């Protein structure tokens, strides 16, 4: 009986800790975003080589009206791809693996904490 109680307490503790880690740190994400600044901005209406990332979390793919997306990204948007945290994580880890023929030349973020942190940063720019 005691073992079950201890196990249940440990399982509950893990459930509360894991989501907190998955949320990421926006301040650390701002530093990670420095790798993105050559091509992206987080200000409304400011496109560079890549589209503005202001409001990207929750946005449909290829939805910035005044940006010329690749045909591959336009097709993903037409299929209904939405940039939720899961899709952003997968894309930012391996852009060309997730959207073959994307215009994004960046190879991807390799560290899971960098992915979580940059997404936390992007969430601060709705």
Language model region names:
Residues 65-82:
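Short Fe-S-cluster ligation motifs
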Residues 44-69:
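N-terminal, post-signal-peptide region of Sec/Tat-exported proteins
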Residues 82-126:
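C-terminal capping alpha-helices of c-type cytochrome domains
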Residues 32-42, 56-59, 91-98, 121-125:
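Structured segments of extracytoplasmic/periplasmic soluble domains
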Residues 1-4:
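Positively charged n-region of N-terminal signal peptides that target proteins for export
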Residues 17-22:
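Sec/Tat signal peptide C-region and signal peptidase I cleavage site
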Residues 23-48, 53:
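Sequence/structural segment immediately N-terminal to covalent heme-attachment motifs in c-type
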Residues 8-16:
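Bacterial N-terminal signal peptides
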């Amino acid at each position: 009986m005691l073992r079950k109680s201890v196990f249940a307490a440990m399982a509950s503790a893990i459930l509360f800790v894991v989501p907190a880690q998955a949320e990421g740190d926006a301040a650390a994400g701002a530093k990670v975003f420095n790798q993105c600044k050559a091509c992206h901005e987080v200000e409304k209406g400011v496109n560079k080589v890549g589209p503005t990332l202001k409001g990207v979390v929750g946005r449909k793919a290829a939805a910035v009206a005044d940006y010329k997306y690749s045909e591959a990204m336009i097709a993903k948007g037409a299929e209904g791809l939405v940039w939720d945290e899961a899709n952003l994580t997968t894309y930012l880890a391996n852009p060309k693996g997730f959207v073959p023929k994307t215009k994004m030349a960046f190879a991807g973020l390799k560290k899971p904490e960098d992915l979580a942190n940059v997404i936390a940063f992007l969430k601060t720019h709705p």
